[in-house]
Amino acid sequence: MSLFDRLFILSQHLTPQHALSRAIGKLADSRTPFIKNTFIKWFIKRYNVNMQEALLPSAEDYTCFNDFFTRALKDGARPIHPDVSRLVTPVDGAVSQAGSIDYGKIFQAKGHSFSLVELLGGDLQRAQPFIGGEFATIYLSPKDYHRIHMPIDGELREMIFVPGKLYSVNPLTTENVPALFARNERVVCIFDTPLGPMSMTLVGAMIVASVETIWAGRVAPMSKTVRSYTYKPGEVTIKRGEEMGRFCLGSTVVMTFPKGAMRWREGLKAETPVRLGEDLGKILQTVATVDEQKTD
């Protein structure tokens, strides 16, 4: 690791992460035309953002930087895989890791794993269905589309806000900060789906102003304790491919599935680029199938 990389990692330990993120968040919400237009145009050029696929292609079309960052795409820009026996990729990004959850641990990077229980807020009962199951972690780079969609039909059961640090989640930090995704502030969403329970964890990061969901808006309790919100059956139902949330300044999504419920598509591994709507994996069994097997 270079000296610059070491200094970058060290600076994150020393930086007042939440104060910096709040300050950047206020700037990103500024509606002053000169500020927001300058910021947006610089960002487009700096990260080579493809505005040809954006529904609104000009910086002047957006009310603030966050409005631009969570921009909508043109119809048809991300077709959803037509085979409903396949899970679809929920975001644009790159796979950080994907594989099995072994002994309650999720692989982060060489030499680093983290606890499934801690990721999901410290509740063993909540994590139990996913032990021995499958996980995938997808990193969204600054230039990516930052809305998050459903990989399968789901009915929201619980949302958990977990306070924590706000380290960067770029590949360099992921490789060098232990248990990163179980240390950063995050929003955990537990869904009931045709293949059983599914968790989608939206991980906050340095200068991520906030995380939003379609049912709760901005999730920013400013709490130092874990907070859980439960939902009645049918209260929040989201179809495969529909939006479920978004990052106001990007981050990472961690998904978990039960053992034997699905299989990742062939070739899905670290650093694989992915796009919303693409084939992510095959559904191997549904809750209905399991129930039928029990009654036979």
From Swiss-Prot:
Localization per record: Cell membrane
InterPro entries, per database record: PS_Dcarbxylase (IPR003817), PSD-B (IPR033177), PSD_type1_pro (IPR033178)
Gene Ontology biological process: phosphatidylethanolamine biosynthetic process
Cofactor: pyruvate
Catalytic-site annotation from UniProt: D92 (charge relay system), H149 (charge relay system), S251 (charge relay system), S251 (schiff-base intermediate with substrate)
PTM notes: Is synthesized initially as an inactive proenzyme. Formation of the active enzyme involves a self-maturation process in which the active site pyruvoyl group is generated from an internal serine residue via an autocatalytic post-translational modification. Two non-identical subunits are generated from the proenzyme in this reaction, and the pyruvate is formed at the N-terminus of the alpha chain, which is derived from the carboxyl end of the proenzyme.
Assembly description: Heterodimer of a large membrane-associated beta subunit and a small pyruvoyl-containing alpha subunit.
Species the sequence originates in: Hahella chejuensis (strain KCTC 2396)
Family label: Belongs to the phosphatidylserine decarboxylase family. PSD-B subfamily. Prokaryotic type I sub-subfamily.
Enzyme Commission designation: 4.1.1.65
One GO location term (cellular component): plasma membrane
Pathway: Phospholipid metabolism; phosphatidylethanolamine biosynthesis; phosphatidylethanolamine from CDP-diacylglycerol: step 2/2
Cofactor annotation comment: Binds 1 pyruvoyl group covalently per subunit.
Reactions accelerated catalytically: a 1,2-diacyl-sn-glycero-3-phospho-L-serine + H(+) = a 1,2-diacyl-sn-glycero-3-phosphoethanolamine + CO2
Residues with Pyruvic acid (Ser) modification: S251
Function: Catalyzes the formation of phosphatidylethanolamine (PtdEtn) from phosphatidylserine (PtdSer).
UniProt GO MF annotations: phosphatidylserine decarboxylase activity
Name of protein: Phosphatidylserine decarboxylase proenzyme
Membrane topology: Peripheral membrane protein
Signal peptide: none
Keywords: Cell membrane, Decarboxylase, Lipid biosynthesis, Lipid metabolism, Lyase, Membrane, Phospholipid biosynthesis, Phospholipid metabolism, Pyruvate, Zymogen
Site features described as Cleavage (non-hydrolytic), chain residue numbers: G250, S251
Keyword Nuclease: no
